């Protein structure tokens, strides 16, 4: 068994054991062999890093909320400790994101030819996602540059997906979902977020007959998430407008 196959086997095993750091390091090594990734390899890479970064994002949110509460309580000594711990988690999160972004730029996006538009959209979406995760914890000038990089990657992926993919394709739908979340949460642009999500949902509904049997479950799940977000975001906007009128 070659190195590549051993690494893939290790990644699958680590996934079953829910040891995502191990899974990510195996898939990083596979990617660095600089050979094209199959759809299964691509998904293993994505799942590994999504879980690794997801754990840090979740920890960061919890600690940030504790930090705000501690600040309100005026407990300086505790605040110092909480702040230091938040910064530690932030560094871990940044390291993970930069690892992924480096793999994308050095190998994955770089090695896509013009006809591999599905892979290219997948990787550009990933690039948008990991810059978005950096934007969640960044501030000042640093935040501006990662926000710009995230939007640029999403936009490039979005253009290719509109030209080359069916509106019901799960990768195109997943991209629309994440890009709309970027507008809502990072850019604080609810109208743009709703417009993008609604357009993606409506386009997919109009072409439901093109739904591929293999991806039916994935596509309908993402459509449901788009609709859930739209419901939530429009009710938030209505609440705000009602508040403004008082």
UniProtKB/Swiss-Prot annotation:
Cite a GO CC annotation. Answer: plasma membrane
Modified residues annotated as Phosphoserine in this record: 25, 59
Q: Which CDD domains does the protein's record reference? A: 14-3-3_eta
Q: Which InterPro entries match?
A: 14-3-3, 14-3-3_CS, 14-3-3_dom_sf, 14-3-3_domain
The entry's note on the tissues where this protein occurs is: Expressed mainly in the brain and present in other tissues albeit at lower levels.
Give me any GO biological process, just one: regulation of neuron differentiation
**Where are the residues marked Interaction with phosphoserine on interacting protein as a site?**
57, 132
Keywords of this entry: Acetylation, Phosphoprotein
Processing and modification events after translation:
Phosphorylated on Ser-59 by protein kinase C delta type catalytic subunit in a sphingosine-dependent fashion.
Family statement drawn from the similarity comment of this UniProt entry: Belongs to the 14-3-3 family.
The protein's role, per its UniProt record: Adapter protein implicated in the regulation of a large spectrum of both general and specialized signaling pathways. Binds to a large number of partners, usually by recognition of a phosphoserine or phosphothreonine motif. Binding generally results in the modulation of the activity of the binding partner. Negatively regulates the kinase activity of PDPK1.
Q: What is this protein called?
A: 14-3-3 protein eta
Show the taxonomic lineage. Answer: Eukaryota, Metazoa, Chordata, Craniata, Vertebrata
């Amino acid at each position: 068994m070659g190195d590549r196959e051993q690494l893939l086997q290790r990644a699958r095993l680590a996934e079953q054991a829910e040891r995502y750091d191990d899974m990510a390091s195996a898939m990083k090594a596979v990617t660095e062999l600089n050979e094209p990734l199959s759809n299964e390899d691509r998904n293993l890479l994505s799942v590994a890093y999504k879980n690794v970064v997801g754990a840090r994002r979740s920890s960061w949110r919890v600690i940030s909320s504790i930090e705000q509460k501690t600040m309100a309580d005026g407990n300086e000594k505790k605040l110092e400790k909480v702040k230091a711990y938040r910064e530690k988690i932030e560094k871990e999160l940044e390291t993970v994101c930069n690892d992924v972004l480096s793999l994308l730029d050095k190998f994955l996006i770089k090695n896509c030819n013009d006809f591999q538009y599905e892979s290219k959209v997948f990787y550009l979406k990933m690039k948008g996602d990991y810059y978005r995760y950096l934007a969640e914890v960044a501030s000042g000038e640093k935040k501006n540059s990662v926000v710009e990089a995230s939007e640029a990657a999403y936009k490039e992926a979005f253009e290719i997906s509109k030209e080359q993919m069916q509106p019901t394709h799960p990768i195109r739908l997943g991209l629309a979902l994440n890009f709309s979340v970027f507008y809502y949460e990072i850019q604080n642009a609810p109208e743009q977020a709703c417009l993008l999500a609604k357009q993606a949902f409506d386009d997919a509904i109009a072409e439901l007959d093109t739904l591929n049997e293999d991806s039916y479950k994935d596509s309908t799940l993402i459509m449901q998430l788009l609709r859930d977000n739209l419901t939530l975001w429009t009710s938030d906007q209505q609440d705000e407008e009602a508040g403004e009128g008082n």
